[in-house]
């Protein structure tokens, strides 16, 4: 069977295309293999350097605790010790300076003529730039979290007295979580709160009718002007008292007036909680 010129050309182009494509794929695979090998070598070098640094850190720490660290100048002696040594040397070798007019005896040799063999000058303090850098474990502890901010989820989980869940705050119908004096209660406050009997949440003056709480004026009085009315409302307490524990314990008898109601109306609201 004899192939025509067109068929031969087509097969040649087809085979050449796939050969070139295969060479390109092989070249890409070889390049990726080289890159991975170089990256592995770099990781091994970094791992060796980290291991050496970890091995040298205990030696440097021991040197700083025992004496001078390797490669650095000896540590500076404490100042109070040098101050104590100076008076001792002064007492052992007093420098007597007698005025020539008051001196009557024979001339005494100078005190510096025969210095003590063990008396040496104090070593100079090393420069500050050669001091040992602080270690990560020697850094001061971070300041405590700000108590005025709500805790994050991790802190709330680890707390001994975690805040109430968000579902409980949403389903609260008495407004207990609307007024928070402090963000976190201490153990003492919680113990005192447990010792106190729970307040009875019942409306006030329900045993009597509403007519007994309403005092109608015997004679009609003119209505106060608007500014006086606003000032009176501002000076007074809240129109609707809340159902918080702190206010129930110190609740006073309900004041009767035009702006007071005989029954406390709870206010619903949402607060941020975990």
UniProtKB/Swiss-Prot annotation:
Strongly expressed in brain tissue including the hippocampus, and moderately expressed in esophagus, trachea, lung, ovary, cervix, prostate, testes, thyroid, thymus, lymph nodes and peripheral blood lymphocytes. Induction: Up-regulated in peripheral blood leukocytes in response to T-cell receptor stimulation. Changing residue 139 to F: Reduced induction of apoptosis. Residues 31-274 are cytoplasmic. The chain crosses the membrane at residues 10-30. Residues 1-9 are extracellular. Residues 2-39 are annotated as: Required for membrane localization. Residues 123-137 have a biased composition (Pro residues). Residues 151-171 are annotated as: Required for internalization. A motif (PDZ-binding) lies at residues 272-274. Residues 90-102, 111-122 have a biased composition (Basic residues). Residues 151-274 are annotated as: Required for apoptosis induction. The modification Phosphoserine is found at residue 64. GO terms for molecular function: long-chain fatty acid binding; protein tyrosine kinase binding; protein-containing complex binding; ubiquitin-like protein ligase binding. Acts as a synapse-to-nucleus messenger to promote NMDA receptor-mediated excitotoxicity in neurons in a JUN-dependent manner. Inhibits ubiquitination-mediated degradation and promotes phosphorylation and transcriptional activity of transcription factor JUN. Might play a redundant role in the regulation of T cell receptor signaling. Might promote apoptosis in T cells. Forms a complex with NMDA receptor zeta subunit GRIN1 and epsilon subunit GRIN2B. Interacts with GRIN1 and GRIN2B. The interaction with GRIN1 is reduced upon NMDA receptor activity. Found in a postsynaptic membrane complex with DLG4 and GRIN1. Interacts with DLG4 (via PDZ3 domain and to lesser degree via PDZ2 domain). Found in a complex with JUN and FBXW7. Interacts with JUN and FBXW7; the interaction inhibits ubiquitination-mediated JUN degradation promoting its phosphorylation and transcriptional activity. Interacts with SRC. This is Proline-rich protein 7. It comes from Homo sapiens (Human). The lineage of its organism: Eukaryota, Metazoa, Chordata, Craniata, Vertebrata. The gene is PRR7.
């Amino acid at each position: 069977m004899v192939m025509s010129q067109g068929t031969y050309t087509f097969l040649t182009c087809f085979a050449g295309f796939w050969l070139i494509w295969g060479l390109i794929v092989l070249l890409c695979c070889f390049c990726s293999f080289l890159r991975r090998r170089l990256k592995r070598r770099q990781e091994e070098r970094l791992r060796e350097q980290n291991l050496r640094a970890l091995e040298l850190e205990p030696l440097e720490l021991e040197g700083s605790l025992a004496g001078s660290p390797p490669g650095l100048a000896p540590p500076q002696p404490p100042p109070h010790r040098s101050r104590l040594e100076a008076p001792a040397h002064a007492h052992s070798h007093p420098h007597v300076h007698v005025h020539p007019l008051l001196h009557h005896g024979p001339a005494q040799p100078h005190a510096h003529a025969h210095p003590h063999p063990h008396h040496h000058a104090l070593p100079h303090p090393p420069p500050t730039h050669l001091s040992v850098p602080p270690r990560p474990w020697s850094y001061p502890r971070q300041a405590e979290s700000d108590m005025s901010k709500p805790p994050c989820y991790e802190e709330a989980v680890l707390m001994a007295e975690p805040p109430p869940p968000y579902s409980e705050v949403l389903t609260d119908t008495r407004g207990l979580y609307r007024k928070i004096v402090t963000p976190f209660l201490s153990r003492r406050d919680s113990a005192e709160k447990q010792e106190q009997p729970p307040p009875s949440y019942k409306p006030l003056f329900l045993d009597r009718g509403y007519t007994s709480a309403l005092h109608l004026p015997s004679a009609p009085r003119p209505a106060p002007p608007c500014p006086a009315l606003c000032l009176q409302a501002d000076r007074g307490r809240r129109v609707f008292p809340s159902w918080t524990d702190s206010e129930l314990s110190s609740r006073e008898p309900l004041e009767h007036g035009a702006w007071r109601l005989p029954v406390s109306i709870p206010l619903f609201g949402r607060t941020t909680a975990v």
